[in-house]
Structures are given as structure tokens and as C-alpha cells.
Amino acid sequence: AYTAPEVRQSTGAVQTALSADSRDVLALGDYQGVDCIREQDGFVYAAAYNGATLKKRKSDLVRTDGGSFSAILSVDGELTGFAFDADGDLWLTVLTPGGGALCRARHDSWGAAVEQVVTQIDGAPLGAVSAVEAGPDGKVYFAVAGGEAVDNGLEAALRTELLAHTGTGWVYVYDPADRSVQRVVGGVAGASGLALSPDGRTLYVSDLGNRCVWSMDADARELTAGGKNCQSAFSGLLGYPGALAMEADGTLYISYRWARSGWLG
């Protein structure tokens, strides 16, 4: 296990212990960076990328067991989030200069095929998609950070929202059964992370600008952040909340963006 050193950070981000199968570092090859990670069936999956700008970015979904690694699929653009559903299919949020997309990836003996599922909302291009979460009932939740331009990627969109505080972030839900898209909650000042409770009944949403995590009934629709039936599960956070992760025992992990050291809370 690796224990974070006791270093005071100007951001005040919470420090905690980290471990990964008794290894401190999982090598992923010559990629420029990693956007997001998940663990599934004993493997670690990471969205690794090359390309300094969004126009040139190519992202691979890389799988590793701590020893060898392999890229199982590739997309053009920024792979901002991914989640496994109950059937083992992958759901992805992908951002390109043309806008965002919710995609589904399926695997067979020929490899992985990625299809775009949602690219527009009410006729307008999907914005800066930032996160995705799959529920046990098959429904797929995805977040749009805000109404900012997507030309420079998710990071730039979130920074703009942090300064402008427009509160134009939304969380949507896609139902594969009838291919419908519904709005879950709006008014988020930088929707940057999603998590579902182990039973799939409660949805958690990171609000970057308000430095809090909202919670609501996963079946709720057309809510407003901070309004009726949408309460703050964690407020006054010492950092800017980003990705969320839920353990089987109900423990919620919150990552902070732009901290001097990227510890989890």
C-alpha cells in the first residue's frame, strides 16, 4: 500500500491512503496522460490519450492487470468517461470539436465496435460531456458540464464554468429499452462526476463551481440543483469535486481537480 505523505496543500484537498494490488504505479506505456479510470473483474481500465489539442487527440481504452496492458478500443477525441453495464457492455462519453456524444461499445470475436447513441438534445449538439454511469436497471446516466464551447476540451470548459458560474450543467438519463433521453437535474455549475448507490436508487452529482455533491432519487426527473428533492450530500468541500466512485459498501470517493497533489477524499 502507498500512504500519502503529510504535505500541506494550498488547495486544502483531503489526503488519504492509496493502493493498487501492492503496486505504487501501473505502467500504461508511452501515453501523454490518463483522463479516467475504473476497476472491473480484477482489471484496471484507463482512458489514455495522445495529442496536445482536442483536434489532434486520440484516446485508447487500456486494460491492465498491473503487469501487461493492452488497448481494447480507440476513439477520436477525448474519452471523458466510461462505465460497464450489467450486461458487460461499455458506455462512453466522448468529446470532439464538433460536440459530445454518448456511445456504446460492444465486443465480439472480431473486436470492439463503438456506436454513437446520443449526439443531440432537443436538436442542439450535445455539449461538454463529462461523466457516465450505468444503473443496475440498464439505464445510463450522463453529465454535460455546462453550456460552454467544447473546442478546447473538457478541462477548458470546466475552467470557464468555474469563472463564469453559469449553472448550465445538466445530467440526463438514456433508456436503451425505448431509446429515450430525459433530464434528471439541471442548474449545476460544472457537472463533473456521477455515481450511483450500490442499489441504484440514489444518484450523486459533482458540482464543481459550488464545491459540493448533490444527491437525488435516480428515478427523479426535471430537478434543479439545490431545489426540491435535490439535496447536498456533501457541501463546503475543500477542493473542486470531479470524478466520483462508489464502493459496494456505500463508501463514496470524491476526486478533486487542480489540486497540487491529486489525492482522493
Task: Enumerate the language-model features and the residues they cover.
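A short helix->beta-strand "capping" segment at the edge of beta-propeller domains
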Residues: 2-32, 66-67
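A short beta-strand motif characteristic of beta-propeller blades
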Residues: 22-28, 68-74, 114-122, 180-185, ...
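Beta-rich, blade/repeat-based domains predominating
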Residues: 29-42, 58, 75-94, 121-140, ...
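Beta-propeller domains
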Residues: 45-70
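A short loop-to-beta-strand structural motif that recurs across blades of beta-propeller domains
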Residues: 58-62, 101-104, 169-172, 212-214
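Short loop/turn segments that connect beta-strands within beta-propeller blades
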Residues: 64-68, 106-110, 174-179, 217-221
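Asp-box/WD-like beta-propeller blade repeats and closely related beta-sheet repeat scaffolds
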Residues: 95-136, 143-150, 154-159
